[in-house]
Regions:
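C-terminal output helix
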Residues: 107-116
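Acidic, metal-coordinating helix/loop segments flanking the phosphotransfer/catalytic sites
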Residues: 35-51, 55, 59
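Short amphipathic alpha-helix used as the core "switch/output" element in two-component signaling
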Residues: 64-76
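Two-component/phosphorelay signaling modules centered on CheY-like receiver
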Residues: 13-33
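Alpha4 helix (beta4-alpha4-beta5 surface) of REC/receiver domains from two-component response regulators
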Residues: 65, 86-101
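CheY-like receiver
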Residues: 121-133
């Protein structure tokens, strides 16, 4: 699909990618998957994503490596951290650094759904504000 909500999934854990794909199935979503920070960076250079779902730790870095770049290149992109350690300090740190949402692993379909709803609402609100400016 090429005209759905553009989403970047950055995950080295197959179970997280499978859960995200299960939730996305049948929705108007154009998803791209990366398992490494360098792959995600290439994707971010070629496309503006509405949402980035990123695991806290990847094979070649962490979500923080991408979050700073997303904020610089595409400040309107919503960034969702998938927290697999379950440590409260990590959760607070991700929010402090600019993530809009933090989902705990194992991912729950309703949590992913809510993150998508928030992204869609945010996109609609930004378009409406731009139209009235």
């Amino acid at each position: 699909m090429d005209n759905g909500l553009p989403i970047l999934m950055v995950s080295c854990r197959p179970e997280n990618r499978k859960m995200l794909m299960r939730v996305f199935d049948g929705l108007p979503i154009d998803s791209y998957s990366a398992s490494r920070v360098d792959q995600a960076r290439e994707a971010l250079k070629s496309r503006n994503f509405s949402v980035v779902f990123c695991e806290e730790r990847l094979l070649d870095g962490t979500y923080f490596d991408l979050l700073a770049e997303v904020r610089m290149l595409h400040p309107a992109t919503r960034f969702v951290v998938m927290l697999c350690t379950g440590e409260w300090e990590e959760y607070l740190e991700a929010l402090r650094l600019g993530a809009e949402e933090v989902l705990r692993c194992p991912l729950q379909p309703t949590d992913v759904d809510l993150a998508l709803i928030h992204a869609m609402r945010s996109g609609v609100a930004k378009r409406e504000m731009a139209a009235h400016a």
